């Protein structure tokens, strides 16, 4: 397979899989009337932005650099939200963006005069979420993200055209329905004054089993009831199962177990495997145990077990233990599946480890080098 020929580490995005996701997302927009935006925080692959732009209405950004990236690589609708905008950046953000969403009333009042040409919105803290982990719960206790309903009382909203909420993380249409119920209960008296409402991200639309028809109905019914334009801003759903991270075995050592050291890193290249945590699937291998050594399955006859580890000094830079049909050898390729979303955007050069190259497998089944990183990239960051 083509994996054997490439320089590692490398992310390989597959165009056909990306288009399949985008076709589904575009279909949701067409059937529901919602406008679907790409959330760059989860997927910002420069070589694929034009492809995504064929299907989605634009990008949602978290600050100046993402807004500039959206302008450079897609140049469609640009919606920008930040927990706190900076004085020296707001002017350029306003010039790039169509929508600007403020996180607090103080920020809205501070920058209203500098954003008069934009469609302005406020982020709502629904104070309700079904997020699977508190780390990813934007509506939890002491959350800095958004404005509570009680703080909307007696506020002049004449300059505000939209409301934004974000309360989901890799979740279902049922979860959105539950959040919408609370959102309408708490913020219903202001929704009718708006031109648009943004349902945020975290919608696992392209995952197998997601109830797409329910999502369409929720968006359409909401829009019809309140007379507003609905926006969705998936990130992970765009990049979901569209490509992999390819690494090579650099060394194999024995310490009670066979340990393969790879030219990649969970810490630097797959950080969510540590943060969530989760154990990545590997091509042509089975998971035996998680990185915390939690047993998942037993080793079968004629299989070979290896602990896959990263090439950094972090003791816990471990991917997990896996079963292979044959013994690994130095130079073998290890392919971590579904590693395009929330990886590239989070990469670090910890320990001076090489940034994985960015590659695209196009519709002709030809590999294109999108970004080939070098020492200079490390030097410029430090």
UniProtKB/Swiss-Prot annotation:
Residues at which substrate binds: 236, 272
GO cellular component: cytoplasm
Catalytic reactions on record: carboxynorspermidine + H(+) = norspermidine + CO2; carboxyspermidine + H(+) = spermidine + CO2
A single GO molecular function term of this UniProt record: pyridoxal phosphate binding
Pfam families: Orn_DAP_Arg_deC
Keyword Cytoplasm: yes
Record's keyword terms, sorted: Cytoplasm, Decarboxylase, Lyase, Polyamine biosynthesis, Pyridoxal phosphate, Spermidine biosynthesis
Cellular compartment(s): Cytoplasm
Listed InterPro entries: Ala_racemase/Decarboxylase_C, De-COase2_C, Nsp_de-COase, PLP-binding_barrel
Domain of life per record: Bacteria
GO BP annotation list: lysine biosynthetic process via diaminopimelate; nor-spermidine biosynthetic process; spermidine biosynthetic process
Top EC class of this enzyme: lyase
Keyword Lipid biosynthesis (UniProt): no
Positions carrying N6-(pyridoxal phosphate)lysine: 41
Signal peptide start-end: none
Cofactors: pyridoxal 5'-phosphate
Function noted in UniProt: Catalyzes the decarboxylation of carboxynorspermidine and carboxyspermidine in vitro. In vivo, responsible for synthesizing spermidine, but not sym-norspermidine.
Similarity comment: family membership: Belongs to the Orn/Lys/Arg decarboxylase class-II family. NspC subfamily.
Subunit structure: Homodimer.
PANTHER family: CARBOXYNORSPERMIDINE_CARBOXYSPERMIDINE DECARBOXYLASE, DIAMINOPIMELATE DECARBOXYLASE
Record protein name field: Carboxynorspermidine/carboxyspermidine decarboxylase
UniProt organism field: Campylobacter jejuni subsp. jejuni serotype O:6 (strain 81116 / NCTC 11828)
Origin organism lineage: Bacteria, Pseudomonadati, Campylobacterota, Epsilonproteobacteria, Campylobacterales
Recorded name of the encoding gene: nspC
């Amino acid at each position: 397979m083509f994996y054997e020929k490439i320089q590692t580490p490398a992310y390989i995005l597959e165009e056909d899989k990306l288009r399949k996701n985008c076709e589904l997302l575009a279909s949701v927009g067409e059937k529901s009337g919602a406008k679907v935006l790409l959330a760059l925080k989860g997927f910002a692959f420069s070589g694929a932005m034009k492809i995504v732009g064929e299907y989605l209405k634009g990008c949602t950004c978290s600050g100046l650099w993402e807004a500039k990236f959206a302008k450079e690589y897609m140049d469609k609708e640009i919606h920008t939200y930040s927990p706190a905008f900076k004085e020296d950046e707001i002017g350029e953000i306003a010039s790039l963006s169509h929508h600007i969403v403020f996180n607090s009333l103080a920020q809205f009042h501070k920058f209203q005069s500098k954003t008069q040409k934009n469609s302005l919105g406020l982020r709502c803290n629904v104070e309700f979420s079904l997020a699977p982990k508190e780390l990813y719960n934007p509506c939890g206790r002491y959350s800095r993200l958004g404005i509570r309903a009680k703080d909307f009382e007696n506020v002049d909203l004449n300059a505000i055209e939209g409301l934004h909420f974000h309360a989901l993380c890799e979740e279902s249409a049922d979860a959105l329905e539950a959040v919408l119920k609370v959102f309408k209960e708490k913020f219903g008296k202001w929704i009718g004054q708006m031109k648009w409402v943004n349902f945020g991200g975290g919608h696992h639309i392209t995952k197998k089993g997601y109830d797409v028809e329910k999502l369409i109905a929720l968006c359409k019914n909401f829009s019809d009831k309140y007379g507003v334009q609905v926006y969705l801003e998936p990130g992970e759903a765009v990049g979901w199962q569209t490509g992999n991270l390819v690494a090579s075995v650099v060394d194999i050592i024995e310490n009670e177990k066979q340990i393969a050291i790879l030219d990649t890193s969970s810490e630097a290249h797959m950080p969510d495997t540590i943060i969530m945590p989760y154990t990545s699937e590997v091509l042509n291998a089975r998971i035996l145990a998680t990185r915390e050594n939690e047993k998942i399955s037993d080793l079968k006859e004629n299989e070979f077990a290896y602990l896959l580890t990263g090439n950094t000094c972090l003791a816990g830079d471990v991917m997990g233990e896996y079963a292979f049909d044959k013994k690994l050898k130095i130079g073998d390729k290890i392919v971590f599946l579904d590693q395009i979303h929330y990886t590239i955007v989070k990469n670090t050069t910890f320990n001076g480890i090489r940034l994985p190259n960015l590659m695209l497998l196009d519709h002709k089944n030809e590999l294109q080098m999108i970004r080939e990183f070098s020492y200079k990239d490390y030097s410029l960051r430090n």
